[in-house]
Amino acid sequence: MGCPNCGSTTFESDTASGNTYCTQCGVVVEQDAIVSEVTFGEASTGAAVVQGSLVSNDQTHARTFGGPYRNQGSVESRELTIANGRRRISALAIALKLNERHIEAAVRYFTLAINNNFIKGRRSQYVVASCLYIVCRISKTSHMLIDFSDILQINVFKLGSTFLKLCRVLRPNLPLLDPSLYISRFASLLEFGPETHRVANDAIRLVARMNRDWMQIGRRPAGICGACLLIAARMNNFRRSVREVVHVVKVADITIQKRLDEFKLTESGDLSIADFRNIWLEGQSDPPSFTKNQKFQQYGAQKVSNIDHTQEYMSPIKRTPDFDGNEVKSEELSQTVKVESQETPVHLKADEREIRKEVTETLKGDELRKISLQVNVKFSEEEVTLEDVDDDEIEDILLDKDEILTKTQVWMELNKDYLAEEEAKNLKLQEDLKKGIVRQPRKRRRYRPRDSTSDGIADTAAESAKEMMQQRAFSKKINYEALDMLFDEEQS
C-alpha cells in the first residue's frame, strides 16, 4: 500500500491514537484502527484483567459491565430464550437417551424457529419437542411422536399439529418413515427372550414384503409393525394376543386386523412358513385401495345389470285388452265407467256402508289385537340368523362368540361404576317400597306459546292482570274488583 498523496511506502503508526501517517508528506493514511489482539490491563487490586469484550456469533452486541461489580452484564431476551430452549432440549434428550449431537442439531432448529418468529404464541415445550423430533427423523432413530408426548405429558395431536406447522416454516428434508426402524424396539418390549432376534428378522422380512405389495405407503408405521410382529410371533410359536401388541405399538386393534386381512389377500399370505423364509416372490400385488375400488365397481355393475334384467321382464302394460283379445279404447272405457256409476242402485251403496261398519268394528275389537300380539311374540322368539348373508361389510361387522364375550367383558369393565350406581338405586327403591315410601315421579309442566288463537286470552289489561294475580296468588288481601274499577277509570 502506498501513500495516496506522494506514493511513498514509509509509514509510522501511533498506537496511542490509532493513526498511521506518511513520513514524507505527513498525510494520515489510517485512523481509529481496530485491533483484534487480546490485551491485558491491571486492576486496582493488582490483578490482570482482559481488556475489551467478546461478541459471539449469536449476539448483536457485546456484554457490558455496568459498574464495578462483575456479574452485572446485560443479556438479550433472545439469548435467554435460546438458553432456556437448550436447557429444555437437553432434559428431553436425556430422557429419550439421545446423544449430544442430537442436542446441538435440535438447538440449531430451535434457533431457526426463533428467527422465523415461530415460538410467539406457542408453548415452548411443543416447539422443543418438534425440533428434537425433526432431528430424530433425519437421524432415523426409533423414536415416535407419542414418546415425546408421554414424557412431556402433553396431547399428541397438538404436538403433531405443531410439528407439521414447523415443517412448513423450516422445510426440512425429512425421509419417509421406515417401519423396520421400530421392529427391534417393539420386539424387545414383547419379551421373546433369546428368540427376539429371530422374531425381529421375520418381522423385518414381512415389512419388506408388505412394502413390495403396496401396503406400507400411506399407512401408519405402528400398524404395519404391529401386524408384522403378530405374524412373526405366530411363526416362531409364540402366543401373543392382539391386546398385548396394541399395548406396545399403541394403535387400535381394528388397525392391526385390517393389515392382517390385507396381507391375507396377497400371494405371500398363501405361502407356508418355510416357503416364506426361503422364497422371495418377484411379483407384487395390487394396492388394497385399488382392490377395494374394484369390488365396489363390480358390485355397482352387477346391481345395474340386475335392474336392467328385471325391467326386461316387467315392462309396463300400456293398454288393457278385452276378453276377445281386442284392445279397448280409453274413450269407450271412460264412458262405460260413467254410465255404470250413474246406474248404481241405492241398495248397493247401503250394502257398502254396512261392510265398512263391520270392518271398522272388527279393527276395533280385541281379537285382532290378540292375533297381532301372538305374531309379534312369535317373531321375537325366533332367533335371527345371518349365516346366509353374502355381503363382505356385514360379515366384517358380525362377531363370533369369543369376540362377543371379550367385547362384553370390556364394556362391563368400562361401565362398572355406572352399573354399581344403578344397582344401588334399585336396592334403595326396593327398600323404600318395603317401608311404604313411594315417590311418585314429578310431572313436568308443558309450557306452550300462547297466541291469538289460544283459549283463555284476556281481552283487556284488567282481565290479564286479574288472571295473573289469581294464578300467582301473591296475597289474599288484594281486592280484585278494585283492580277492575281502577282500569275502568283510566280508560274513561
From Swiss-Prot:
It is found in: Nucleus. A zinc finger (TFIIB-type) spans 1-30. One of its GO terms (cellular component) is nucleus. Belongs to the TFIIB family. General activator of RNA polymerase III transcription. The gene is brf1. GO terms for molecular function: RNA polymerase III general transcription initiation factor activity; RNA polymerase III type 3 promoter sequence-specific DNA binding; TBP-class protein binding; zinc ion binding. Zn(2+) binds at C3, C6, C22, C25. Gene3D superfamilies: 2.20.25.10, Cyclin-like, Single helix bin. The keyword Nucleus applies. Keywords: Activator, Metal-binding, Nucleus, Transcription, Transcription regulation, Zinc, Zinc-finger. Its main location: nucleus. The keyword Nucleus applies. InterPro entries: BRF1_TBP-bd_dom, Cyclin-like_dom, Cyclin-like_sf, TFIIB, TFIIB_cyclin, Znf_TFIIB. TFIIIB comprises the TATA-binding protein (TBP), the B-related factor (BRF) and a third subunit (Potential). Interacts with maf1. This is Transcription factor IIIB 60 kDa subunit. Residues 440-468 are annotated as: Disordered. It comes from the Eukaryota. GO terms for biological process: DNA-templated transcription initiation; RNA polymerase III preinitiation complex assembly; transcription by RNA polymerase III; transcription initiation at RNA polymerase III promoter.
